[in-house]
Regions:
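Active-site rim/loop-helix segments in enzyme catalytic domains that contact anionic ligands
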Residues: 1-103
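Metal-dependent de-N-acetylase/amidase catalytic core
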Residues: 1-6, 89-179
């Protein structure tokens, strides 16, 4: 069975900026790559004349096109609004649901330790909410049947993620060769 990798980002494009190179390589090697995008992209960009509904469609199309180039098996959207993510139990449950559905061996997401203001893109509130929520979803919630027992009714059994990697970190300690 192919190794499964889940890359989680707040917005359409986050996952590609952070990991498209290694994900493309791994997809070519036969690994199954899944993207989970938490927001719908309705406020993406500051210099456009599009309505939020138009932005949602544009950003979904762009994300799907990028995912196709990378070799992503599936792009999953939570559909939440840009700028409104909170590290709460609702977001954590949504993340646990997807983790239990996909059953990834590895997860990639934002670094929850990056709480210093070194750049706008790293300190975006949606990025911070996703970072904390992913960390909390993986341990202990995704692997513990007592968290979100309602997911068991739908057949979503607990799943233990074997490896967790953070991107957007101030202190990288691992590099992947994408040449």
């Amino acid at each position: 069975m192919a190794e499964k990798i889940l890359v989680i980002g707040a917005h359409p494009d986050d996952v590609d900026f952070a990991s498209a190179g290694i994900m493309s390589r791994w997809a070519k090697e036969g690994k199954e790559i899944y993207y989970l995008i938490c927001t719908n992209g309705d406020k993406g960009g500051t210099q456009n004349n599009h309505t939020p509904a138009q932005l949602v469609e544009i950003r979904k199309a762009e994300q799907r096109a990028a995912a196709d180039i990378v070799g992503v098996k599936e792009v999953i959207y939570l559909g939440r609004k840009d700028g409104e993510l909170m590290p709460d139990m609702g977001l954590r449950e949504d993340l646990v649901r997807v983790i239990r559905q996909v059953k990834p061996d590895k997860v990639f997401s934002f670094d929850p330790a990056n709480q210093s203001f070194d750049g706008f893109h790293l300190f975006h509130p949606d990025h911070r909410a996703v970072a904390i929520s992913v960390f909390d979803a993986i341990y202990p919630a995704a692997k513990n049947r007592l968290y979100f027992p309602q997911l068991l009714v739908g057949g979503l059994e607990p799943h233990k993620v074997e490896e967790l990697y953070f991107y957007g970190t101030k202190e990288p300690n691992i590099w992947f060769d994408i040449s």
